[in-house]
From Swiss-Prot:
SUPFAM superfamilies: Nucleotidylyl transferase (SSF52374), P-loop containing nucleoside triphosphate hydrolases (SSF52540), PUA domain-like (SSF88697). Residues 396-574 are annotated as: Allosteric regulation domain. Its EC number is 2.7.7.4. The record marks F331 as: Induces change in substrate recognition on ATP binding. This is Sulfate adenylyltransferase. 3'-phosphoadenylyl sulfate binds at E435, T436, V437, R438, R452, I478, A479, R516. The lineage of its organism: Eukaryota, Fungi, Dikarya, Ascomycota, Pezizomycotina. The adenylyl-sulfate kinase (APS kinase) is non-functional. It is involved in allosteric regulation by PAPS. PAPS binding induces a large rotational rearrangement of domains lowering the substrate affinity of the enzyme. Keywords: Allosteric enzyme, Amino-acid biosynthesis, ATP-binding, Cysteine biosynthesis, Cytoplasm, Methionine biosynthesis, Nucleotide-binding, Nucleotidyltransferase, Transferase. Residues 171-395 are annotated as: Catalytic. Sulfate binds at Q198, R200, A296. Catalyzes the first intracellular reaction of sulfate assimilation, forming adenosine-5'-phosphosulfate (APS) from inorganic sulfate and ATP. Plays an important role in sulfate activation as a component of the biosynthesis pathway of sulfur-containing amino acids. The active site is at T199, R200, N201. The gene is MET3. Pathway: Sulfur metabolism; hydrogen sulfide biosynthesis; sulfite from sulfate: step 1/3.
């Protein structure tokens, strides 16, 4: 029999409100709406299907305050992560958000109304306190803290929700079990004990050995329950990961394991997140939950120190084990013993026994370079999936982003680099000069700081898509502001390499060699907002390469860029 849900009752709002669906649908069509972000959609899905039981909506101020300070909802139930609906002042005013108001919650992807929230309250959180209490630090090297300060809006809206419809998914539909569906599935299979395994990474032989070992020790079955909502920036995409999990499943003894996907937006909150994960798995019917070393940790802070200790998460869940009602299965890192061809937890291996390990960094290197990945580490069918999604370095896309004053020589360098890379062959090459983008993509934009930032954001989006497709993107806007250049880097680096080339030709040289006379017009006041004349240029502090066409020619500058690309393995021939 499945584990009772957290709080005693599974808050399956989809099932609860099904008899009123048409009535709620008709009402929502007439209501003002809040369009939900990706994180809010993930949160709403787990509110609606009962994954976040005992929640029945987004937290009001009383619940939020209790969770932040004490891991407690207002009714005393344990809950460790704030589940909040953040909105801007503009949205509050436009939509008419106020206590007692009924607001539709709309899916940004297909414009469908998913639920109606009855507003309990609107409050302004202390985000510094939230960061320190929930995540243990206000350091923006933590992705959740960065999100809190730079993405989450300034006000939170609390209130219960009524379900109109479930979110629509088009990928792996057969693996997307709600808590109620998964409980029924366990019951159908006759499973009494279920060990849940949380992951946001591909699984290899060590993970299989770990989960089988946990099942054997508890005489239980295994739920592989990976997160396919939002994970840590830079993680492998969920499409690749799910194909890996599917490839791995036949390696389990028949009838031992089930794969189900969890649409969770992770916060990488370490100890607090581990408690939250345990609650979610309890709601899905699991009786046991594996908590590993540095569970849901975000890595290192801005000082190079881990945000959390390696076993802080295990300690946090153990502290609340009786109240959680789910047995924690702590585990050490598994290591391979070549002499006996087996995996064991590191704490069970004598110091004189030979062991082998491959780190995540080493695995990524081997995928990038095409080096062998041994069968003792991962199964051939898993490696095949990973290689399909991670081609060798010389088949990956990249972006070269040239920035500098008007007439600094960046356009000439970009054109010459375009010719050079096309001659090299092996991938398609796209050239996006500043003036081309202005005429084709950003013709309605002016030269205010806001419009310049929008222009760079559009360039970054196009470059990222080209990079993702394995192409070389060469872009050459003026891009005078550090913040927009950094945002461009972050956008592109989700999919491939980004190289910032500062064409540091001095302003006086660019102006002196200007044959088109644009600097003269700017000096005469005929052109306003001209970079270097009446608008600033913030020189890059983190350029990957600096060239100066007042001291070197275009051919030499291009050769320097080619050497940079070659040093990263991007131009190496197969």
């Amino acid at each position: 029999m499945a584990n009772p849900p957290h709080g005693g009752v599974l808050k399956d709002l989809i099932a609860r409100d099904a008899p009123r669906r048409q009535e709620l649908y008709a009402e929502a069509e007439k209501l003002p709406a809040i369009v939900l972000s990706d994180r809010q959609l993930c949160d709403l899905e787990l509110i609606l299907n009962g994954g976040f039981s005992p929640l029945e909506g987004f937290m009001n101020e009383k619940d939020y305050t209790g969770v932040v300070a004490e891991n407690r909802l207002a009714d005393g139930n344990l809950f460790s992560i704030p589940i909040t609906l953040d909105v801007s002042k503009e949205t509050i005013d436009e939509v008419g958000v106020k206590a007692g108001a009924r607001i539709a919650l709309r899916d940004s992807r297909d414009d469908r109304n998913l639920a109606i929230i009855t507003v309990d309250d609107i409050y302004k959180p202390d985000k510094v306190k939230e960061a320190n209490e929930v995540f243990g630090d206000n350091d923006e090297a933590h992705p959740a803290v960065k999100y809190l300060h730079h993405t989450a809006k300034e006000f939170y809206v609390g209130g219960k929700v009524e379900a109109i419809d479930r979110l629509e998914h088009y990928d792996y539909v057969g693996l997307r079990y709600t808590p109620a569906e998964l409980r029924l599935h366990f019951d159908k299979l006759g499973w009494q004990k279920v060990v849940a395994f949380q992951t946001r990474n591909p699984m290899h032989r060590a993970h299989r050995e770990l989960t089988v070992r946990a099942a054997r020790a508890r005489q239980a079955n295994v739920l592989i329950h990976p997160v396919v909502g939002l994970t840590k920036p830079g993680d492998i995409d969920h499409f690749t990961r799910v194909r890996v999990y599917q490839a791995l499943m036949p390696r389990y003894p028949n009838g031992m394991a089930v794969l189900a996907l969890l649409p969770l937006a992770m916060r990488m909150g370490g100890p607090r997140e581990a408690i939250w994960h345990a609650i979610i798995r309890k709601n899905h019917g699991a009786t046991h939950f594996i908590v590993g070393r540095d569970h849901a940790g975000p890595g290192k802070n801005s000082k190079g120190v881990d945000f959390y200790g390696p076993y802080d998460a295990q300690d946090a869940v153990e502290k609340y084990r009786d109240e959680l009602g789910i047995e924690v299965v702590p585990f050490q890192q598994m290591t391979y013993l070549p002499d006996s061809d087996e995996y064991k937890p590191k704490d069970e291996v004598a110091k004189d026994i030979k062991t082998l390990d491959i780190s995540g960094t080493e695995l990524r290197k081997r995928l990038r370079t095409g080096q062998e990945i041994p069968e003792w580490f991962s199964y051939p069918e898993v490696v095949k999936v990973l290689r399909e999604s991670h081609p060798p370095r010389n088949q990956q896309g990249f972006t070269v982003f040239l920035t500098g004053y008007q007439n600094s020589g960046k356009d000439a360098i970009a054109r010459a680099l375009n010719v050079t890379l096309n001659q090299q062959g092996g991938r398609s090459v796209s050239l996006l000069l500043g003036e081309t983008v202005r005429s084709e993509l950003s013709s309605e934009l002016g030269f205010s700081r806001e419009d310049r930032d929008k222009n760079i954001a559009r360039i970054a989006f196009v470059a990222a898509e080209l990079t993702k497709a394995g192409a070389a993107a060469i872009v050459a806007p003026i891009a005078p502001f550090q913040k927009s250049r950094q945002q461009a880097r972050e956008t592109v680096e989700k999919y491939g390499s980004f190289f910032l080339v500062h064409v540091a030709t001095p302003l006086d040289h660019a102006e002196k060699t200007d044959r088109r006379g644009v600097y003269a017009k700017a000096r005469a006041g005929e052109i306003k907002g001209f970079t270097g004349v009446d608008d600033p240029y913030e020189a890059p502090e983190n350029a990957d390469l600096v060239v100066d066409t007042s001291k070197t020619n275009v051919r030499t500058a291009v050769h320097q860029i080619v050497l940079l690309l070659e040093s990263q393995g991007l131009l190496t021939q197969l």
